[in-house]
Amino acid sequence: MAETYQPSLRAQILTRRTYNRALNEEGTQFETWAHTVARVIEHQRWLWKRQLRRPLNKTQEAELEELRGLLLARKVGVAGRTLWLGGTEIAKVREACQFNCAHLEIQTVDDMVDALWLLLQGCGVGVTPKSGGISGFTQPILDVQIIRSTRQDKNGRETNLETWNPETKEWTISVGDTAEAWAKSVGKLLAGKYTAEKLTLDFSEIRPAGTRLTGYGWIGQGDETISVAYRAIIEIMNRRAGQLLRKMDIHDICNWLGTILSTRRSAEISLFEYGAPEWQEFAVCKKDYWSKGQPQRGMSNNSLVFYQKPTRAELRGIFDLMLASGGSEPGFINGAAALNRAPWFSGVNPCAEILLGNRAFCNLTTIDLAKFKDNPSGMHRAIYIIARANYRQTCVNLKDGILQHSWHENNDFLHLCGVSLTGVVRRPDLGPYELRLLRNAAIMGAYSMADELGLPRPKNVTTLKPEGTISKCYDTTEGAHKPLARYIFNNVTFVKHDPLVNVLREAGYTIMPHPNGSGDWVITLPVAWDDVEFETVNGLEVNTETAIDQLERYKLLMDNYVEQNCSITVSYAPAEVDAIIEWLLQYWDHYVGVSFLLRADPLKTAADLGYPYLPQQPVTKEVYDAYVASLKPLDLESLKAQSEDAVDMGNDCAGGACPVR
């Protein structure tokens, strides 16, 4: 019998919002966790049976039941993509939708089509812009007409329709109402080199906003975002008429494509080589981007790639740029160390935990170390089982009629896995030896699955991802990060019509109107970490780690567990920059890339900082205990579900541009 686990209310809310699919068209009935897990297991069975070309035997079925038990107990997790889409029909025909991570160099129109296709499926996409293969319009097109959709149903034409009239010089692109049509439409827009005097973009076939997409399960945007993005792309193509697009032009087009599915579903990272043309413009392109009329630039995390070890002065210069732009960007990646770990390296995914080639994917899994205290054999068995599941998730057919064939070829060669750890700071007993044993168990699991299937072994297996969402769902600390404090009030935004608001109000939760005047609500959810060490400062037990403390944990994991990269956000104060630079110069060969974020003072209240509330507010044990004692028990799975996208738990990474779950 599978072990049961009773998650916290916060975990239930986030699981419902992020991974439990709607069971009806109205979006009022949702899966339970057991339903979601059953769907994942069916997806695993389907992948395994397809590869074997026969039904599973008793031993193989028993392994799936073992995996089911680990998932139900929230001890291991599969990719967020698989939790959301695994077992659905769309996952069997658009198999790229199962991948968290992708990267490609953008040099041709076909590459741009691939990027939009992946973004539309919810994949996190890393891009390296390359000039020389995409040009602007033949001549500026000054007469641009946008025809918006007024449809009230979702039965629009599924394909694009393009016409060119050489007599009237009118070029028309009518966009169809499918993801395939949208992806191909950007190809038509970028590839058309007509001597046009008028361009009409017709979106009238697109279904209305607010319609649930049956296959993907999320809410459609209508033509609102795509019409804005395409007009902006036309402006870029006009500006470069008769010229090759610069890398920054390609970067901006990719960012505009990222806005089409909304910030809720799209994640990008853009990479420029340090010292190459346009790197300096790229390095500061997000500074005050909104006030400069470049809202799309908020869509991507931006990083510079060093292929030579930087000097102290160069690192100081990068940190000066970061501090001038808010403390986080541009990030920087050690391309030489990445190539040592992954000779195929061309770039990374948005959170930078996977070292990817050009047109390469990776799928992720995780294990919660905190649920295996005093059970090392169970921990090793669990990571072995989830690594085998991870390999099966790489056994996909990517020949979907949109992606270039090399995506499929590269995946067949690399079979990249991403077996990650979470709850790391809850297991300080795991030193170098124990971490190497875990790494070996994961590698053995993935290798054994490959050998049984007669397929290439994965070129890399272990990683460490930020683990933001899955860790909240599993009631554990996030990846290699240490929480802000032992006792936290997590203030969470709920939309105004969410039926959970009244339920939580009746249960005694603190609820206040959102200060933005939208009618939404902010609800206080309590979180505690009893098994993590904190320092007591002014009566609060808070995280006082230095930047070097965090970098040393990164190095420990990189040296002993991680084959790819450990994605962490290092919080720092400006006064620590010199020490960080010294650490980087000393350990540059151990470093691939981290995110940096200016440290928030955990002792400051919202009032101290001039805010109406803080997403996470440290509190004393007495305040925490009194609040928890005042709450009535709830079980979300027994309640009517809220609508999809009803809860905002905040961003999952330092740049705020990676909400891929």
Tell where the protein language model's regions lie, with residue ranges.
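Extended catalytic cores of very large enzyme megasubunits
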Residues: M1-R661
